[in-house]
Amino acid sequence: MSAIYNFCAGPAMLPAAVMKKAQQELLDWNGQGVSVMEISHRSKEFIALTQQAESDLRELMQIPTNYHVLFMHGGGRGQFSAVVNNFLGNHGRALYLVSGQWSSAALAEAQKLVGEAQIDSLNIVEKHNGLNAVVLPDLHKIDADYRYVHYCPNETVDGIEIFDELDSPWPIVADLSSTIMSREIDVSRYGLIYAGAQKNIGPSGLSIVIVRDDMLKLPSLPQSSIMDYRLAVEHDSMFNTPPTFAWYLAAEVFAWLKSTGGISSIAKINQQKAQMLYQCIDGNAFYRNGVVAANRSQMNVTFQLVNEALDGEFLKQAQIAGLVALKGHRIVGGMRASLYNAMPLDGIVALVKFMNEFAAKHS
C-alpha cells in the first residue's frame, strides 16, 4: 500500500511509531494481560504512567517548578470557559487579543459567561498590501487592571502564527493547542498555557494545562468541579476518571518526541517543512497565500488556487495521490495543509511534487 499523508488540522496524524506501539500493546499493556483502557486509573501502574508523562513534558518544555501540569477534560473549548471561571471571580476583568477564528471564539465564550463589561478586546490583525499581518499592541500603554491577557499564537483556520513574544504587564494566558511543542518557548513568561491534545499531543478528549502557582490565588467563579484548576492540582488531575487512553497516547508521544531529539530538533524540521511548502506556493502563480511572510503559520499552511473552479479536482487528485484532508476550513475555503510534529518531511516532498505537477497540467 502506498504511503498516506494526513494533513488534517485536528484530530491530526500521530507519529507512526506511537501508533504501532499502541497497536502492539492494545490487548496487553505493560504485561498486565489487559488493555490500558481497562485498568484502574488509580492503579500503581497507571499512576506510574502519568508521572512519567508529566516528567517528560516538563523536560521537553523546560517547565519551571512553580508551575503545575494538569491533564484535563474538554479540549480547547473547555478551557475557554475554565480560564474565565477560574480567574474572573469578584468582577475581575480580562483583555482578549483577537487574531483569527479561535481567539474570536475564546472571546465570545468569555463575554457569554461574564458579560462584555468584564471583557475587553483588541483586533491585532491588519491588512498590509492586501495580506493579513499581526500588529502587536504596546500593552504597557493601556491603563487598566486586568487579571490576564489572552491570546492564541497560532490560528489554524486563518494560517496565522505569532512568533514574537508577547510583552504584557498582566499574566499571559495562551491557547497553544496547535503550536505546543512545535518550537521552543519560555514557559516562565506565561501565567497559564492550555492546549487541546488533538494536534501535537495525542487524540481528542484531553487537554493540557500548565499553570503558575500564583494564578491559583485569583478569585474564581462557581463552576463544574472537573474544570476547577485548584481541584485538579489537589487531586493530581484525577478528581474524577480521566480519559486514560488519551493520557497513555500523550505519554507515548512525549517519549517519541524525546527520542527524536526534543523540541529544538523537531522545530528545525518543522521550519524546513513549512519553508518547502511556502516556496512552492510563492514560486507558482497558480497558488496564493493571504498572510505576510512574518506571520505565516508553520503548523497550518493555508493557500488558494487562483482558479477556484479547480478546487474540487485538486482535492480529488490529491486524495488519489495519498494526500488527504487538504480541504480548507469551511469558514475560509481554499486549501490547508497541517504540518504538525508527526508529519514527516516525505509528506511535504510528496505534496510539493503533486502541487507542481497539478499546476503544470492545469495552467
Curated annotation (Swiss-Prot):
One of its GO terms (biological process) is pyridoxine biosynthetic process. Keywords: Amino-acid biosynthesis, Aminotransferase, Cytoplasm, Pyridoxal phosphate, Pyridoxine biosynthesis, Serine biosynthesis, Transferase. It is an enzyme of class 2 (transferase). InterPro entries: Aminotrans_V_dom, Aminotrans_V_PyrdxlP_BS, Pser_aminoTfrase, PyrdxlP-dep_Trfase, PyrdxlP-dep_Trfase_major, PyrdxlP-dep_Trfase_small. SUPFAM superfamilies: PLP-dependent transferases (SSF53383). Coiled coil: none annotated. Its cofactor is pyridoxal 5'-phosphate. It is found in: Cytoplasm. L-glutamate binds at R42. Its EC number is 2.6.1.52. Binds 1 pyridoxal phosphate per subunit. The keyword Transferase applies. Pathway: Amino-acid biosynthesis; L-serine biosynthesis; L-serine from 3-phospho-D-glycerate: step 2/3; Cofactor biosynthesis; pyridoxine 5'-phosphate biosynthesis; pyridoxine 5'-phosphate from D-erythrose 4-phosphate: step 3/5. One of its GO terms (cellular component) is cytoplasm. GO terms for molecular function: O-phospho-L-serine:2-oxoglutarate aminotransferase activity; pyridoxal phosphate binding. It catalyses: O-phospho-L-serine + 2-oxoglutarate = 3-phosphooxypyruvate + L-glutamate; 4-(phosphooxy)-L-threonine + 2-oxoglutarate = (R)-3-hydroxy-2-oxo-4-phosphooxybutanoate + L-glutamate. The modification N6-(pyridoxal phosphate)lysine is found at K199. The keyword Transferase applies. Pyridoxal 5'-phosphate binds at G76, R77, W102, T156, D175, Q198, N240, T241. Belongs to the class-V pyridoxal-phosphate-dependent aminotransferase family. SerC subfamily. Catalyzes the reversible conversion of 3-phosphohydroxypyruvate to phosphoserine and of 3-hydroxy-2-oxo-4-phosphonooxybutanoate to phosphohydroxythreonine. Homodimer. This is Phosphoserine aminotransferase. It comes from Shewanella baltica (strain OS185).
